[in-house]
Each structure stands twice: as C-alpha cells, then as structure tokens.
Curated annotation (Swiss-Prot):
GO biological process, one term: neuropeptide signaling pathway
Species of origin: Urechis unicinctus (Fat innkeeper worm)
Function according to Swiss-Prot or TrEMBL: Contractile action on the inner circular body-wall muscle of the animal.
Lineage summary: Eukaryota, Metazoa, Spiralia, Lophotrochozoa, Annelida
Domain of life of the native organism: Eukaryota
This protein's name: Urechistachykinin-1
Gene Ontology, cellular component aspect: extracellular region
Positions of post-translational Arginine amide modification: 10
Length: 10
C-alpha cells in the first residue's frame, strides 16, 4: 500500500 493511496484515502 503506497503512502499516496493512504493519503488519498483520508
């Protein structure tokens, strides 16, 4: 899981 996706999920 990339940090970019994690941030976008927020």
């Amino acid at each position: 899981l990339r940090q970019s996706q994690f941030v976008g999920s927020r």
